[in-house]
Design a protein with these regions (language model features):
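N-terminal beta-strand motif that seeds the catalytic metal site of vicinal oxygen chelate
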Residues: 1-20, 73-80, 120-122
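Conserved short beta-strand elements that form part of the metal-binding/catalytic scaffold
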Residues: 30-70, 116-122
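Core segments of cupin and vicinal oxygen chelate
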Residues: 3, 10-52, 85-88, 92-108
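Short, low-complexity, polar/charged sequence segments that are solvent-exposed and flexible
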Residues: 71-75, 96-98, 117-118
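Short, acidic, Ser/Thr-enriched surface-loop or helix-capping motifs
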Residues: 111
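Mid-chain, well-packed structural core segment of small domains
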Residues: 65-90
Length: 122
């Protein structure tokens, strides 16, 4: 028997609602804010139970990748059908394509808060 259920993934950021909106739009999910929340927490939720959470951090500093001055501690990989089309779409949402591209079957981007994430063909 499992001790726990699927964990939520929580990303630190300066603006939880803005980053939840970015990921919810990219994944075609819904943004959920708690009624008693003061804006320091937001969630992007799918219809089938998956969730990304976003927590406000005062004086947030984005990770520096691929360097290690402020290393990333995790990153998200999302599967897409077409790297060019998906890349253009996430840039339109506010992402930035990273200058360092170490592979051919994925592309590295930075979300609006500076977290690295990858668009992957599989």
């Amino acid at each position: 028997m499992a001790i726990a259920r699927f964990p939520s993934i929580v990303l630190d950021c300066p603006d939880p609602v803005a980053l939840a909106t970015f990921y919810a739009t990219m994944l075609d999910w819904e943004v959920k804010k708690h009624a008693d929340d003061d804006g320091d927490w937001a969630e992007a939720r799918s219809d089938y139970g998956q969730c990304l959470c976003f927590q406000q951090v005062v004086d947030y500093a984005a990770p520096v990748w691929p360097g290690q001055d402020r290393p990333q501690q995790m990153h998200l990989d999302v599967v897409v059908d077409d790297l060019d089309a998906a890349g253009a779409a996430v840039v339109e949402l506010g992402a930035t394509q990273h200058e360092h591209q170490p592979g051919t079957t994925f592309r590295v981007f930075l979300d609006p808060a500076g977290h690295p994430f990858c668009l992957c063909l599989s």
